[in-house]
Swiss-Prot record:
Monomer. The presence of 4 different heparan sulfate N-deacetylase/N-sulfotransferase enzymes in mammals, as well as differences in their enzyme activity suggest that some initiate heparan sulfate modification/sulfation reactions, whereas other later on fill in or extend already modified heparan sulfate sequences. Expressed in brain, kidney, liver, fetal and adult lung, adult pancreas, placenta, fetal spleen and fetal thymus. Not detected in adult/ fetal heart and skeletal muscle. Keywords: Disulfide bond, Glycoprotein, Golgi apparatus, Hydrolase, Membrane, Multifunctional enzyme, Signal-anchor, Transferase, Transmembrane, Transmembrane helix. It catalyses: alpha-D-glucosaminyl-[heparan sulfate](n) + 3'-phosphoadenylyl sulfate = N-sulfo-alpha-D-glucosaminyl-[heparan sulfate](n) + adenosine 3',5'-bisphosphate + 2 H(+). The gene is NDST3. It comes from Homo sapiens (Human). Its EC number is 3.-.-.-, 2.8.2.8. Residues 1-13 are cytoplasmic. This is Bifunctional heparan sulfate N-deacetylase/N-sulfotransferase 3. Glycans are attached at N146, N226, N342, N392, N658, N794. The chain crosses the membrane at residues 14-34. It is a single-pass type II membrane protein. It is found in: Golgi apparatus membrane.
């Protein structure tokens, strides 16, 4: 019995212990279950102890994920649609700066509070490959109709959205972003950021290490996400302000950029919690453009860097290199080769100044020449004179021969094919004598300049080819002849470091596939800022990007450049007097006054020669001298004559006796339908007035055909007019060529609109060719008013109708007349009815478009056009 009682008590004790254990287990499990739930929704205090080196413990799902598959990006044009708050907004300008630096096409719209979206689709093709909102709230709060249209477009064409959240209040904000399953906190200060290495977004950016320190600004927005459809890209810790919301964990990591993977609604989005002032945000922005465009808007990861050291042997005492500086240059070159493949400093010398420093500096000169094979070399000018100051080629040749003789005496290679002019003088604006002398003495194939098309902004710098010399853009790096001491750097040493570490110099490398950097001898003596700059730049680029840095010899580099940018081969000449820097490095013997104030652009066979005769009758209007090679017309803007340069062009014009009252002009009737002429003309003479004459395009086509017959064109003699204009695509090439010259210039609206892309409407005068033929005095009064030329010339008294010739002529003294030559006003059989009917139908749509354009411009319809439009009804 006692045994049974003992067993019973033991059993009770065991049950109580088990029950107690179960209760404790339940309590512990409940505690950890609750803690786990809380950790998923609020970033716990433990997160503050986590560093970027231990990313797997961060409170986000950081496993590698796959975003929505992008659609075929070829279904859209490679153009970015950018919605900005205003055309002057700071963030909007930063966005445009990156797009322009990357040479991506874009279209700007002011983000509408209400109203219609721009047209998104044209002929079943999407107009935009990517949409960027400077203020993402304008996208989120869009009215439902336009939002559904935009989202439908994005889904159908696989178009992504990039947006920036801008806080409007000064206090810390916390709210749910409309339509998105996560919370955001605004107006925060953050620090210590790192990159999610699993983000599918990053390409240029390397997830390497923690970026310690405070991030710029106190207006940051951070995202608290807990959904597999959203992936953080960058994290940062929230700093602890006094008014920090209780829901924000102190020192916790939050996302400052998130990637909506498109799993929810089929649209991928990248949302930024701040502007682009922070360099890492700017880098991710570049990657986001590449990713969301299906890599159609992307640059290669290869970066070619050439570091020029100008002014070798030049410089006053105390600023030059000594032996230790030269040894440091060699050591650093070897060091840089570990990070920049084939890195070699490129030394530009002026032999006249050899051994003109202190004794130690002269020894430095000798040390350089003793290591001549370790570097690349290029000629500066012998005496460091600016080439534009030499007015004849022979003087330039003499200077170059002296420098070449020095090179040969000291074993400096003379076959690199590269040269740089002091202060970039003579390269652009072009000093032809420099190009010719370079070819004769050095056989130069490449040079570089920071002046084309202008020094600033640097992102607009381009290359071109002239006289078979390839001209590449040159970049500055913040080092000039006077920047030789670290502590005395303009703005303080931090300014140089900021440029290197995510600033201007860093992004020069990121955004330019090829960079030729200008430095100077003085940057490698004293504090050796040149070495400091490029060692630290290479380290920073390697640490934070996946870019592949390398160096090529100059000629190879130039060929690589024009492989990447073949559209830059043709130069675009500008007026040197419109840029003070250009004017300063342009010969004082030249003048911009010899550029025309207006152009008569054609088209051919509309009466342009008659207009020319009437214009030169005016005492204040002067024309170009005739060209013996192109039927008296200069034909500069539309032909290869353009590559002869502006000196060649201006030589056709006289120097005006009075710049204010004299009007220079030229007539080249082929300009009208030229693809290149409008852009070229607008670049060189942007304020020039443009005059065109329009007659019935059917009559113009027939007149051109007869003109070609009179010049014994084989196709015109062989085929009838109707056979020419109605020829099919399989017709002989010579017949198709004649057909094109007959018909295409008559597409009046298309050609005028091309000119209006580059010239404002008030600079364009459209003359009714039929009225010019019947009432030239009235037309010439209109022309004088349009040009603003004085004194007013009375054409009613100066013109007389020649009934024998059939057109108006200039009335001279004693009743004599001056008329157009025998080739003008030629009579020929009337056009056959079949051809007239064919052309009336062919030009119908073109004439309708012309009427719409003239109505839009507020210009009257010519009488012939009104007659043609009546046939349309």
């Amino acid at each position: 019995m006692s045994f049974i009682m003992k067993l019973h008590r033991h059993f009770q004790r065991t049950v109580i212990l088990l029950a107690t254990f179960c209760m404790v287990s339940i309590i512990i499990s409940a505690y950890y279950l609750y803690s786990g739930y809380k950790q998923e929704n609020e970033l716990s205090e433990t997160a503050s102890e986590v560093d970027c080196g231990d990313l797997q413990h961060l409170p986000y799902q950081l496993m590698e994920v796959k975003a929505m598959k992008l659609f075929d990006a070829s279904r859209t044009d490679p153009t970015v649609l950018v919605f900005v708050e205003s055309q002057y907004s700071s963030l909007g300008q930063d966005i445009i700066m990156i797009l322009e630096s990357s040479r991506f096409q874009y279209h700007i719209e002011i983000a509408p509070g209400k109203g219609d979206l721009p047209v998104l689709i044209d002929k079943m093709k999407g107009k935009y490959i990517l949409i960027i909102y400077e203020n993402i709230l304008k996208y989120i709060n869009m009215d439902s109709w336009n939002r559904s249209l935009l989202d439908k477009y994005c889904v159908e064409y696989g178009v992504g959205v990039i947006g920036f959240h801008k806080t409007s209040e000064k206090s810390v904000q916390s709210f749910q972003l409309k339509g998105f399953p996560f919370s955001i906190y605004g107006n925060l200060a953050v620090k210590d950021c790192c990159i999610n290495p699993h983000s599918p977004l990053i390409r240029v950016t390397k997830s390497s290490k923690l970026e310690k320190g405070s991030l710029p600004g106190t207006d940051w927005t951070v995202f608290q996400i807990n959904h597999s459809a959203y992936q953080p890209v960058i994290f940062a810790k929230v700093k602890t302000p006094e008014n920090l919301s209780p829901s924000i964990s102190k020192g916790a990591f939050y996302a400052t950029i998130i990637h909506d993977l498109g799993l929810h609604d089929g649209i991928q989005r990248v949302l930024f919690g701040n502007n682009l002032n922070f360099w890492l945000h700017k880098l991710i922005f570049i990657d986001a453009i590449s990713f969301l465009s299906g890599k159609r808007l992307t640059l290669s990861l290869d970066r070619y860097i050439l570091v020029d050291i100008d002014d070798i042997f030049v410089g006053k005492e105390g600023t030059r290199m000594n032996t230790n500086d030269v040894k440091a240059l060699l050591d650093t070159q070897n060091l840089l080769r570990a990070q920049i493949t084939n890195f070699t400093f490129n030394l530009g010398f002026s032999g006249k100044f050899y051994h003109t420093g202190t004794e130690e500096e002269d020894e430095g000169d000798d040390c350089l020449l003793g290591s001549v094979d370790e570097f690349w070399w290029f000629p500066h000018m012998w005496s460091h004179m600016q080439p534009h100051l030499f007015h004849n080629e022979s003087s330039l040749v003499e200077q170059m021969i002296l420098n070449k003789k020095f090179a040969l005496e000291h074993g400096i290679p003379t076959d690199m094919g590269y040269a740089v002019a002091p202060h970039h003088s003579g390269v652009y604006p072009v000093h032809v004598q420099l190009y010719e002398a370079w070819k004769k003495v050095w056989n130069i194939k490449i040079t570089s300049t920071e002046e084309y098309p202008h020094l600033k902004p640097a992102r607009y710098r381009r290359g071109f080819i002239h006289k078979n010399i390839m001209v590449l853009p040159r970049q500055t790096c913040g080092l000039f002849t006077h920047t030789i001491f670290y502590k005395e750097y303009p703005g303080g040493p931090k300014e140089l470091d900021k440029s290197i570490q995510g600033g201007e110099l860093f992004f020069t490398v990121v955004l330019n596939p090829i960079s030729i950097f200008m430095t100077h001898l003085s940057n490698y003596g004293n504090d050796r800022l040149g070495l400091y700059t490029f060692v630290n730049l290479a380290n920073f680029v390697k640490s934070w990007t996946n870019l592949r840095l390398q160096t090529l010899p100059p000629v190879q580099l130039a060929h690589k450049y024009f492989e990447l940018f073949p559209d830059q081969k043709d130069p675009l000449w500008q007026n040197p007097c419109d840029d003070k820097r250009h004017r300063d490095i342009w010969s004082k013997e030249k003048t911009c006054d010899r550029l025309p104030k207006f152009l008569v652009i054609g088209p051919q066979k509309t009466g342009t020669t008659a207009l020319y005769l009437f214009l030169v009758m005016h005492p204040s209007i002067l024309s170009n001298s005739p060209s013996p090679k192109t039927f008296e017309e200069v034909q500069f803007f539309n032909r290869n004559n353009y590559h002869r340069g502006i000196d060649w062009y201006m030589d056709f014009f006289p120097v005006p006796s009075n710049v204010t009252t004299d009007f220079l002009f030229e007539k080249s009737a082929n300009y009208f339908h030229s693809e290149e002429a409008p852009k070229r003309a607008a670049s060189l003479v942007p304020k020039a007035k443009i005059i065109t004459i329009l007659i019935d395009p059917s009559d113009r086509a027939y007149s051109w055909y007869q003109h070609q017959r009179s010049h014994e064109d084989p196709a015109a003699l062989k085929f009838s007019f109707y056979e020419v204009i109605s020829a099919g695509p399989r017709a002989p090439s010579e017949l198709r060529a004649l057909q094109k010259r007959c018909l295409v210039p008559g597409w009046y609206a298309s050609h005028i609109e091309r000119w209006l892309v580059y010239f404002p409407p008030f600079q364009l005068l459209i003359i009714d060719g039929q009225q010019l033929r019947t009432d030239p005095a009235t037309v010439m009064d209109e022309v004088q008013k349009f040009l603003g030329v004085l004194p007013h010339y009375n054409y009613s008294e100066a013109l007389t109708f020649d009934s024998h010739k059939g057109f108006w002529c200039q009335l001279l003294e004693e009743g004599k007349t001056k008329c157009l030559g025998k080739s003008k006003g030629r009579k020929y059989p009337p056009m056959d009815s079949d051809s007239r009917t064919f052309l009336s139908s062919y030009y119908r749509d073109h004439n309708v478009e012309l009427s719409k354009l003239l109505h839009k411009l507020g210009q009257p319809l010519p009488s012939w056009l009104r007659q043609e439009l009546q046939k349309v009804r």
